[in-house]
Curated annotation (Swiss-Prot):
Its main location: nucleus. The keyword Transcription does not apply. GO terms for biological process: maturation of 5.8S rRNA from tricistronic rRNA transcript (SSU-rRNA, 5.8S rRNA, LSU-rRNA); maturation of LSU-rRNA from tricistronic rRNA transcript (SSU-rRNA, 5.8S rRNA, LSU-rRNA). Keywords: Nucleus, Repeat, Ribosome biogenesis, rRNA processing, WD repeat. Belongs to the WD repeat WDR12/YTM1 family. It is found in: Nucleus, Nucleolus; Nucleus, Nucleoplasm. It comes from Chlamydomonas reinhardtii. The keyword ATP-binding does not apply. InterPro entries: G-protein_beta_WD-40_rep, NLE, WD40/YVTN_repeat-like_dom_sf, WD40_repeat_CS, WD40_repeat_dom_sf, WD40_rpt, WDR12/Ytm1. GO terms for molecular function: ribonucleoprotein complex binding. Required for maturation of ribosomal RNAs and formation of the large ribosomal subunit. This is Ribosome biogenesis protein WDR12 homolog. Pfam families: NLE, WD40.
Length: 444
């Protein structure tokens, strides 16, 4: 019988002190994979119940045995491996779903804290937009709170501004408009929040596909089928201006919601895309990303209005996402079913050096969302009806959700960066369903 090969391993972590094991090297079987290593950490920490852990060697997630990792990286079995352990991300389970009258085109769950992180009962609000033109508000159990006719022809995008700007929400639609809304609490004890139109932004000549606020929330960008990428002034100061106008009786004409509305002030027109600009992300105050049907992803210097970097691919870019902690990195989904990552610190435009293919779906990748509390985790959604969770340090998905019965069109995380955690997802699609997923172990 062959003698069992062992490897010296030193376990390290950035977790709090009560989750740290001694860094003294220990000998472990070389055929151990993630599960076996997780058992060792749980044993050393005497955790009850046990917790799942993931492991990294030189920044790469371990998905093979230690022996296979040594061979793949041409490392000696005599050397001591430094292995970092982190909490494993466990795919969530569907908690609730609720029907819409039409396709669900966009969702935002950043103002909703799931039950697992709020003492047993969900709190906050989830917003959704759909092809019937309605903006809907839901509580943490996906019970209807309010709805308002927001856009003629359908809502394309719904996005909260950062909390520093108060309870302000942006929507865009097929009617060429962008609108800003104020969420306010009802005076009735059992009633939920309501929506009031604050401002209407006109400047696009075709449907507005997406909006994204700057980190401060004082500006936002919009993009659409007219090939335009526009930067606007917005935020709390505009809400205040609208309120002042109402108080002084100098009202502008409003649309379909009650209350007075200001006319949004336009800013820069960032020119460069040759076709529909499908998506926009704004990770740093002076730097934003856009993606379009001209197969390109562009990083813009907002101050100069010029494209700082451009990646030219071979297929239409349908969605993009970024993270404030890694503003040089952008994830984007394409019509060739691939999810890609572009590190703009690499050689711009070089597929070999700057862009990596994270993974693939069975259909167009229509939505991607970066976890607000982790720069390593993203989720993607596709026309194949699935949602996949990824750690960008490996090309193997962490898990897949397949509850939708038709194309998934919208995706977001529950809880924002301000909450310091994200323990769930919310999604919508062509099956006219809004779905919520929760887990005890996602990212915190």
């Amino acid at each position: 019988m062959a003698e069992e090969t062992q490897v010296l391993v030193k376990f390290v972590t950035k977790l709090p002190a009560h989750l740290r094991v001694p860094e003294t090297p220990v000998a472990v079987p070389s055929d151990l994979k993630r599960y076996g290593l997780s058992q060792i950490i749980n044993h050393l920490l005497a955790l009850d119940p046990p917790r799942p852990f993931d492991f990294l060697i030189d920044g790469e997630l371990v998905r093979k045995s230690l022996e296979q990792h040594l061979l793949a990286h041409n490392l000696s079995a005599e050397s001591t491996l430094e292995v970092e352990y982190v909490p494993a991300v466990v795919p969530p389970q569907q908690k609730n779903s609720t029907p819409h009258d039409d396709w669900v085109s966009s969702v935002d769950g950043s103002r909703c804290a799931p039950a697992s992180s709020s003492g047993g009962s969900p709190s906050g609000v989830v917003v959704s937009g759909s092809y019937d033109g309605l903006l809907r508000l839901w509580n943490g159990d996906l019970e209807a709170v309010a709805s308002v006719s927001a856009h003629a022809g359908g809502v394309n995008c719904v996005r909260f501004l950062p909390k520093s700007q108060g309870d302000l929400l942006l929507t865009s639609g097929k009617d060429r408009l962008v609108k800003m809304w104020q969420l306010s609490s009802s005076e009735e004890e059992d009633a939920g929040p309501s929506c009031r139109l604050v401002a209407t932004y006109r400047g696009h000549e075709d449907g507005v596909e997406a909006v994204a606020a700057s980190p401060s929330g004082r500006r936002f960008a919009s993009c659409g089928w007219d090939g335009k990428l526009l930067v606007w002034e917005g935020g709390e100061q505009l809400r205040w201006a609208a309120g002042t106008a109402e108080a002084s009786k100098k009202k502008r004409k409003t649309g379909t919601a009650n209350g007075s509305a200001a006319a949004g002030a336009g800013g820069a027109d960032l020119r460069g895309h040759l076709h529909c600009v499908s998506s926009v992300a704004w990770p740093a105050e002076n730097s934003l990303f856009s993606g379009g049907w001209d197969h390109s992803v562009r990083r813009w210097d907002v101050s100069s209005g010029a494209a700082a970097d451009t990646y030219n691919g071979s297929k239409a870019v349908l969605c993009i996402a970024s993270h404030a902690a890694s503003p040089a990195l952008v994830a984007f989904g394409c019509s060739d079913r691939a999810l890609r990552l572009w590190d703009t610190r690499g050689k711009a435009g070089s597929d070999a050096l700057a862009v990596t293919t994270q993974g693939a779906h069975g259909g167009w990748v229509t939505a991607v969302a970066w976890c607000p509390s982790s720069q390593h985790h993203i989720a993607s959604a596709s026309h194949d009806g699935t949602i996949k969770m990824w750690d960008i340090r490996t090309q193997i998905p962490l898990g897949m959700l397949s509850h939708h019965t038709d194309k998934v069109l919208a995706l977001g995380w529950l809880g924002g960066a301000e909450a310091g955690h994200a323990r769930g997802l919310v999604s919508g699609g062509a099956d006219c369903q809004l779905r919520m997923y929760e887990s005890d172990y996602i990212v915190s």
